[in-house]
């Protein structure tokens, strides 16, 4: 676990790197997440003060964009498409299978810390649905057997 001094130091370095940038909040949040693997709650008031925003404004942006994490992810991130096109070809069944196989729900990480399961909306692979992203790599035509193979490769 990171201490508040380390968080403050690293966040201030990121803020300084974005000085003078127009509309820096999103790039700052992305940089913090790239550095920490998530955006620590302790970073929000530091960002707010530096950008002359309220904490609510910073939190609002954080919560609006689904890719920002408030907690560290597992070693691997499995994202399953939840858009209508994928749902029409079995994404709900695939999602239920993945949740059961991993023993977790959406936005949770397995007890061993290896896999985080997240919903994502439209990956642009509609013709190859159900679709997924495994550690940033797109995967199409995902079914229960493919989910089992993916999960097996992540553990």
Which positions does each model-derived feature cover?
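Signature of N-terminal electron-transfer/Fe-S-associated modules in redox systems
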Residues: 1-155
């Amino acid at each position: 676990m990171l201490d508040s001094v380390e968080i403050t130091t690293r966040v201030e370095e990121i803020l300084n790197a974005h000085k003078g940038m127009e509309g820096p909040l999103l790039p700052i949040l992305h940089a913090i997440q790239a550095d920490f693997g998530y955006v620590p709650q302790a970073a929000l008031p530091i960002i707010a003060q530096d950008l002359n925003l309220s904490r609510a404004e910073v939190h609002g942006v954080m919560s609006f964009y689904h890719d920002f994490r408030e907690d560290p992810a597992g070693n691997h991130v499995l994202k399953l498409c939840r858009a209508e096109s994928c749902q029409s070809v079995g994404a709900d069944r695939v999602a239920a299978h993945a949740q059961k196989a991993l023993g977790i729900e959406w936005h949770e990480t397995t007890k061993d810390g290896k896999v985080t399961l997240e919903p994502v909306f439209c990956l642009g692979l509609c013709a190859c649905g159900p679709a997924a992203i495994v550690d940033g790599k797109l995967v199409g035509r995902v079914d229960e057997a493919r989910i089992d193979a993916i999960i097996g490769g992540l553990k």
